[in-house]
A protein has these predicted regions:
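Active-site hotspot residues in diverse enzymes, especially metal/ion-binding acidic/histidine motifs
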Residues: 1-188
Length: 188
């Protein structure tokens, strides 16, 4: 499902995936900065009820928190692509109403939708084959630099490698750690 989405909206396959271009140009959604969204509500962003815009915390968008910004956009794209039917009968015009909309859902459903959003975002921004290639490149570079006892089962080694790989995808090392575990490159 993610691969089909990426091929449709990012057919070049170039890394990093320009998720802002997909949201703004390919899908024509507005990206609206909201001051203090995270501080007031504990969220980085949300999709408008009419699916015309992604609202995102001003600090995330404007203050160079690039990785969070990109991941938040990808996460909201997941809700648009996977959970569009949820919004068919949704009616919220404020963050408070959006929060009430979410709270009205059973906790198990809400958790499942959020998990799907995180998984979709990670797969969109860090494609499986490209991740494998970048991990192999990182291991090779480490060996060439004399770090021959690199062990991705050691958390510190894995985390350093994940930070390096993450920079290639414009995502955090944490995203790479999760994606790498999901794809079997190391234990969870």
């Amino acid at each position: 499902m993610v691969e089909g989405f990426r091929q449709r909206y990012w057919p070049s396959g170039a890394i990093p995936v320009d998720v802002e271009f997909i949201v703004d140009v390919k899908l024509g959604l507005d990206i609206v900065a909201v001051p203090h969204l995270y501080r007031a509500y504990g969220i980085d962003g949300f999709l408008a009820a009419d699916r015309s815009a992604v609202y995102i915390d001003h600090a995330v968008q404007e203050h160079s928190i690039l990785y969070r910004y990109r991941f938040t956009l990808a996460h909201e794209l997941a809700h648009l692509h996977l959970h569009g039917a949820l919004f068919d009968n949704a009616s919220f015009d404020s963050v408070e109403e959006w929060r009430d909309f979410l709270r009205a859902m059973p906790e198990e459903s809400r958790s499942w939708y959020e998990w799907q959003g995180y998984a979709f975002a990670g797969l969109l921004l860090v494609p499986r084959d490209a991740l494998t290639q970048k991990i192999e490149e990182a291991v090779e570079r480490a060996h060439e630099a004399g770090f021959t006892d690199l062990d991705l089962g050691v958390e510190a080694h894995r985390d350093i490698l994940a930070e390096w790989v993450g920079r290639r995808f414009d995502v955090s090392g944490e995203v790479v750690v999760r994606r790498g575990a999901y794809d079997g490159h190391w234990d969870r």
